[in-house]
Amino acid sequence: MQPRVLLIAALLALLATAAEDKDASLLDVVQGYMQQASKTAKDTLTSMQESQVAQQARDWVNDGLSSLKDYWGKLKGKFSSFWDSTFEDTTPSPAVA
């Protein structure tokens, strides 16, 4: 074989190998990017779900406290009228001379 043919064959082999490495490298970069994008989307979705769960928990607690305050207000109203009438009955009347 002539040296030119060997040189051309070697250059073609190097170019083919370099192109293959470049494609593999590009594929790795794209895969890494997609994995990162997928992880970011998953983290965002999880954060939103946790936020929704936390909001539901806060609403539940607030509703419970509101109901408790209403119940306490009604109970207090009933007993305050009871206590007021009890204290009026037991208040000593002024001495009549």
Swiss-Prot record:
What are the site positions for May interact with the LDL receptor?
39
From the Swiss-Prot or TrEMBL record, state where the protein is found: Secreted
Renumbered to this chain, the signal peptide range is 1-18
Domain of life, per the record? Answer: Eukaryota
Recorded GO MF terms: high-density lipoprotein particle receptor binding; lipase inhibitor activity; phospholipid binding
Q: Matching Pfam families, A to Z? A: Apo-CIII
Name the Gene3D superfamilies on file.
Apolipoprotein CIII
* InterPro entries per the UniProt record, alphabetical: Apo-CIII, Apo_CIII_sf
Q: Which parts of this chain are annotated as the region Lipid-binding?
A: 66-97
Key word Acyltransferase present in the record? no
Q: Does the keyword Lipid metabolism apply?
A: yes
Q: What GO biological process terms does the UniProt entry carry, in alphabetical order?
A: cholesterol homeostasis; lipid transport; lipoprotein metabolic process; negative regulation of high-density lipoprotein particle clearance; negative regulation of low-density lipoprotein particle clearance; negative regulation of triglyceride catabolic process; negative regulation of very-low-density lipoprotein particle clearance; triglyceride catabolic process
Spell out the family assignment given in the record's similarity comment: Belongs to the apolipoprotein C3 family.
Function (record text): Component of triglyceride-rich very low density lipoproteins (VLDL) and high density lipoproteins (HDL) in plasma. Plays a multifaceted role in triglyceride homeostasis. Intracellularly, promotes hepatic very low density lipoprotein 1 (VLDL1) assembly and secretion; extracellularly, attenuates hydrolysis and clearance of triglyceride-rich lipoproteins (TRLs). Impairs the lipolysis of TRLs by inhibiting lipoprotein lipase and the hepatic uptake of TRLs by remnant receptors.
Q: Which PANTHER family match?
A: APOLIPOPROTEIN C-III
Name this protein carries in UniProt: Apolipoprotein C-III
Source organism? Equus caballus (Horse)
Lineage of this protein's species?
Eukaryota, Metazoa, Chordata, Craniata, Vertebrata
